[in-house]
Amino acid sequence: MPSHSKNKKRKSKSKGGSTVKKSGGLLEKGIGNITAELYNDTDDYPTSRVIKRAPNGDVIVESLPTKPKKSKSRQTNSSSNNDMILDLDSHWEWLSPEEKKNILRIDKDEVFEMLSRYNNHNSNNVNGNTNNNNIIGTGSNNLSGGISTNSNNNTSSSCNCNVCGRRHMAMDQEMERIYNRLYEMQRENYEDMTHIKFHLNIIKDLQKRKTQMISPPASPEMDSNNVDEAREPNSGSSNESLDIKNDLETMRDEVVKYFLSPNSVDTLKKEVLNFKHNKQKQFQTPISLNEDNTEEVVEDNEAQHIYDDLSNEIHDSGLIESPRTVEDDANIIDIESKSRYLNFAKTFISSHPTIAQEYVNKMIMYPEMKELTDDLMNNNGSGFIKAIEEFVLDKQKQNTLPDTEIDINDVNSQQHENPEEALQVQDLGDAKEFTTMLHNGQPLTSDEYANLQRHIAERVTDAYNTETKEFEGISQLEKELFTRFMHGSDRRQFGDSILQLFKNKYDDKLSANSISTSLAAAASTITHDIISPRNDDGNDTEEDIDYYDDEDDVSSENIHHRNDLDDDFKSREEYSDYNSDFHDNRKCEKYNDFDDDDDYLDNNRNLECAHAEHNHETLSTYHHDVDLADSNSHGYKNYASHHTSSQVSEDYIDDIDDDGYESGIDENERLEEGRKLLQITITKILQRRIMESYHAKQAENNRMKLLEELEAEESKKKEKEEKKQRKREKEKEKKRLLQVAKEEERKKKEEEAERLKKEAEEREMERRETQRKKVEAAKKKKDEEKKRKLEEQRKREEEQERQRKIKEEQKRKKDEERKQKELEKKKKDEEKRIQEEEKRKKEEEAEQKTLNEKKRLDVEIMEQKRLEEEEKRLKSTASTSNVPYAELLKMTPSLQPVSGNINDELFGMINAATSSQSIPTSSSHLNHLLQQNDASHFNMTPRHDLLNPSGGMHFGPSDLIEQSHFTHKSNSFDTLAAINDPTTPQTTLPYGNSSVPPNSFDISSWGNFNGSSTAETQLQSQLPQQSLLGSHSVTSDQNRKSFNEELNTITNLLSTTGLEDQLSQKDSFAHSSLWGSQGTSLSGSNPNLSSNFAPAGLPINQTPISPGNIGIPTTTHRSSIWDISSGVDYSLNDNKITGSIQSERPLSNVIPSSYMSPNIWSGGTSKIPVIEQPLVFNPNENQTNPISNIILRELSLLTLPNSTDQYVSSELLCQKVMANRIDYGVYFTELMNLRNAHKIEIASNDNGQVTHVKLVYKSKDELEMPLNSSENQNSHIQMQQNYGLQPISSTTAGNTASTTANNANGSTINTSNSHFFNINKTISNPSVTANIWS
């Protein structure tokens, strides 16, 4: 015994228990959980006890059995049924529809196999039953003898076996005939009847018959008295015999009540006894006993049959095996097998010899233990382990469903009328999906869903009527929800809640079984109300019948007989210590007493009919087996099946009790008996399948627990590895031989298949060859026909091609002729066009020559007129001047007009020639450039009005600025361009308060600015010529020549005319040449500039000022308007201050930046001053600004000698500087630059206008030093602060100094609103920087 057994016993004593302990065994707790459990903790530890050891080594403490203990154990049976009920119901509910269908599909062969197997089994066990009869105690000998005599008497009169009676036909043949007859009868009613449907209909008939049976008039009390009276004369008994009889009666009642519901036990007895009475009265079977004793014995036998039916059912069905002794099976298991089993038990169960022997004895008594042991010995337990694994997997998926039962009568009738009801229950859908739909598509939370279920459960509970067993006052929606919850995935929880509510409400009125039954019946009514409208289709398929029959069985069996299966399963588990872990020890212990009683009852089975030559007990035993199978399987159909099977069994026995085949039983009764027997057989098959399925599930759990024990015993297995290895080798050898046999069989089959395949291939090849020949013949014929058609097609195409070529040839010839005519016509048209073109050219040339000649004459006439007008102007000037005209001509000989100037004549001719040329017709645009070059030159004619020796050259400072004003020309290219434009109106700007005409510098004194305007006369004399130059815009296109022709004409003209003519006067400025510089050139001298002005009667300098000696640059030819590459030379009279502007010098350094030209052709300046960049030289250049030098020079001349603080009037200085052809804007900008450079000082009045300027004397080096832009800015800002001057760009008064240059009437500076000077003086010529070439 293991060392820990004492600890187990000590624990048992500490608990103080006195009842039997049984360990969970290998399959429940494992090796490590060895404890002694007490059923009743309040009792003391049993003093009369038996200490045993379980096969797995656990200690078992059992008290000695006593009668009170047995009675108490039997009383506890009903309380332990509820646990099994839940397990069985859960197992059936969790079976898949396919598994349920498989259980309900019963074939004909299976029915007859079941009949044959149980018939043979009962025949083979006749000897065993006889031996059991001999073991009965002495107290039962009298009873057994009496019954034996009765049996002998029955034998002499008639035989009840399946061979001797009737037509001496075997039972199997008779049942097959009856089966076929019943099947044909069913087929006459149903065309689509099959064997499966036939079997299910038989079960339905059984259920219907149960509901229609009439209760017998006899009472159970009278029957019991009759049984007692029949037994009392035969027993001659002692007290022990009476005790045995009482025990037998008590045992019989308890067993019947155990397997049937309490309400149906008395009804079943009445029906059986009534049936027996009717049969006996009908056949009048003679018996040797007196009438009273016979009736008593029959009643006693009938009661005995009821119990024997149930007990034999337990043993023979394999669900609860009856214990057998070792002597009964001595012939089955020999000594050698016993020794092997004993060694196995010692190795794997327990090393204790007593325990091992006990295991072998139980194994011999129970075939399932023997099968398990053989599997462990032969296959190393692989089958058992696999079964355990499957069981565990199924157990994990298994859930217990609510304890709801459906009344068999209602559900059977409903499903009989609506065969598809079970399937449509599944079609209701998931309850959660339905609630989601009711909740507008939003799923309920878990709490809301639980609350809804609880509400429906309470509503159903309150609406249940215990009298009518129906739900009243429930809405259709509540019924729908109830049905979906009952069939949903969480139906177990919902069912538990429903059941609990019913128990709480009706626990005082109803028992638990009645609650479940009532609830199921009412639930089936609700479900039927929901589903029944959907049973539209009356055509039931085989699967549908299987399914709803399955549900029918489930419903009917759940109503009445779940308690029976609970006991069956527990009874069976008690016999195997190996499988005893599924239920606790209390459930198994209660069957110990029952097994003892079974041993006693088995000894009394000889009370049934027995024959000397035949085994008459076979039939009755068979019926008993079938009847009890009804009661033992999963609990389905137990009541109806047992009830009906008991009747069939009794009926069949009584029928056999008739004397002979020629009895009064007709064919209909035979068929009815066969139907009942088939009902019993089919019911037994269904019950066996359900129980097998259930035990398979349970075995899976047992397997997993056994695996745990096997792992715990791994150390023991290592010690005996050699023995196992030999066994495994033997098993492998057997498997190898079996595999070899299978392989040979497989090879034979493959060879046969190969041979058949080759034969088939040969036949196929022959067929294909025949087919190929047929196809080739057909193809050959088809090809010939195709060739013939192709040949015909080719001939047709050749003919069509020939006709097409003929048509094409004709068409080609026509096209050639048409093209030839078109070419000739085009040639003639071309010749005609050429002739017309030549004629037109000749006409144009003649017209052009005429036009040129006319233009030349017009130019000569205009030039002549101009010269005449010039002479007149000069004469008028000379007459108005104080100086005589002759002296004036003598002083300025260069101003005399040169009438024979060839250049002037050529200039007019070229202008006349180019004016007729169209700009767009010139490919090189030279004509356009020539026009611009002409426009960029202005003819500087002699200005006689500026040289007036007698007019007085002294200027007065009084009214110089007030009487003079400046006017500005419009923004045109220059004077010539403005005159050439015929559309420009010759308007004259107002001259203000001055009476002096514009362009006049004939000043006789400082107080008078009067003088004749020679410049105006000069411009007027030039108008005809300039107008002629612009006449090309109206020349017609047809009179134009190409540019090349015109150029050639001009070249020829120039070549024939001498260009060597010299000017008659040396000092005169010649006209600018056409091919000369594009920049501004002076064509004449200005007498007004020939002398320097001096204050207070200083003599005028007689040296004339030319463009070279006043510092105005003489530009050279430029290729574009942006070209400033040519250097500019400045010369300033006798001072010889010269400088050159480099090619990289920007144009803005020459043109004042304060007033920029608004366009590139305008010689004037903009009205918008640009003060941000005053006119200063680049500090990096070693240059001096010539305009600044002019201002300084004029200022120094106006300043008295040796006077350092003398201020000069700014108006006088402005007049002197502007006499050098400098714009006022340039003058003022340079004046500000000089002030910023601290070379001059400026004085202003209260209005901020510059009134006086003073020269600041510095050294010569500082005078020549270039101005710095930063210093200029700083000094400018400082000067503004010192003198309170406003910035030049200031617009405080809303006025801005502006200039307008190159007006047609002269150059005028308009500063009427200026902050600096309020002057309106005209100047004779525009600024030298008034065009883009300067």
Swiss-Prot record:
Biased composition (Acidic residues): 538-555
UniProt biased composition (Low complexity): 15-25
Positions in coiled-coil regions: 694-876
Basic residues biased stretches: 1-14
Sequence segments annotated as region (Disordered): 1-82, 212-242, 530-565, 712-849, 977-996
Function: May act as a negative regulator of salt tolerance.
Family: Belongs to the NST1 family.
Listed name of the protein: Stress response protein NST1
